[in-house]
A protein has these predicted regions:
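Conserved ABC transporter NBD signature motif
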Residues: 34-42
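Conserved ABC ATPase "signature" region
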Residues: 41-42, 83, 90-107
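Conserved ABC ATPase signature
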Residues: 112-116, 120
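A short, proline-enriched helix->beta-strand linker immediately N-terminal to the Walker B motif
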Residues: 131-135
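Conserved ABC ATPase "signature" C-loop
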Residues: 191-192
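ABC ATPase "signature
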Residues: 197-198, 206, 277
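The conserved cystathionine-beta-synthase
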Residues: 239-262, 266-271, 278-293
Length: 293
């Protein structure tokens, strides 16, 4: 199941079935069996006309290679999905201009794709997908072709927009750092099958098998694992202790400890209530790379 208004990451090695899977969701590739249920309606039961309408209204897609129309201006590229919905030109321009501004490209309305950098073109692709106001966003290796700094910038733009829009996003990637940064849940594929589907913390702390362990073995655990994932539960704080938020990562906890040595570490929720404590042993075990078989 993919949770509504969350980012579901799907990752795996090349050839594991990631891109095939995402194209099954909107039937760009026809599934051979099974069901695709969206709000209890089976996408496989839709007629050609119903499927076309479903793609126009309910689901948008962002591709790795941008897929912009080279002969259309940026504003017309963003408004393309709206033109298919038969909206008037004034409405299309208004909506497209809004999303162009949201992705930081105001002033580029009359440019053509070949006049923009790769990162700028992918911003246009994201704006085009969002302009249709579809509830579901499919992103197939959307940032993989970008330089590291531009990729990080696009990840931040996506997260900022998601905090406001609460879309249901299926995000395909082979980059574990990217998956851990943006995913509410991560599904790891192997030969078309899901090996593990869990939240990022659980993936790192409790890999399902050796295949998943190999995926995560080189990750900097201190930058990923949060206090709430390794704490022991308690309800009353210790007097004179160091209080940290449940979402603080271990790397930042270490920084706090160097400023406040010899203090017990208490973990608080977002309301400031003590919910646990962390011992030095728990902290070190969280940072330590698990033993390989």
């Amino acid at each position: 199941d993919i949770a509504k208004a969350k980012i579901q990451v799907v990752m795996g090695l090349s050839g594991s079935g990631k891109s095939t899977l995402i194209r099954h969701l909107n039937r760009l590739i026809e599934p051979t069996f099974g069901k695709i249920l969206i709000d209890k309606k089976d996408v496989l039961s839709l007629s050609k006309k119903e499927l076309l309408l479903f793609r126009q209204k309910n689901m948008s897609m962002v591709f790795q290679k941008f897929a912009l129309f080279p002969h259309k201006t940026i504003i017309d590229n963003i408004g393309y999905g709206l033109s298919i919905q038969s909206l008037s030109k004034d409405v299309r321009i208004e909506k497209a201009s809004k999303w162009l501004k949201r992705v930081g490209l105001e002033g580029y309305e009359e440019y053509f794709p070949n006049q923009l950098s790769g990162g700028m073109q992918q911003r246009v692709g994201l704006a085009r997908a969002l302009a249709t106001d579809a509830e579901i966003l499919l992103m197939d290796e959307a940032f993989s072709a970008l330089d590291p700094l531009i990729r990080a910038d696009m990840q931040n733009i996506l997260l900022d927009l998601q905090n406001e829009l609460h879309k249901t996003i299926v995000f395909i990637t082979h980059d574990l750092d990217e998956a851990l940064k943006i995913g509410d849940k991560i599904a790891i594929l192997r030969d078309g099958l899901i090996v593990q589907d869990s939240d990022p913390q659980d993936i790192i702390l409790n890999p399902a098998d050796e295949y998943v362990s190999d995926f995560i073995k080189d990750i900097n655990r201190a930058r990923v694992i949060k206090a709430k994932s390794i704490m022991s539960k308690i309800s009353k704080p210790v007097k004179g202790s160091l209080s940290i938020n449940q979402n603080m990562v271990l790397e930042d906890i270490l920084q706090e400890i160097t400023k406040n040595p010899n203090k017990d570490i208490m973990v608080e929720n977002n309301q400031g209530k003590t919910i646990g404590k962390i011992s030095i042993k728990e902290l070190l075990n969280g940072i330590k790379r698990p033993d390989t078989k």
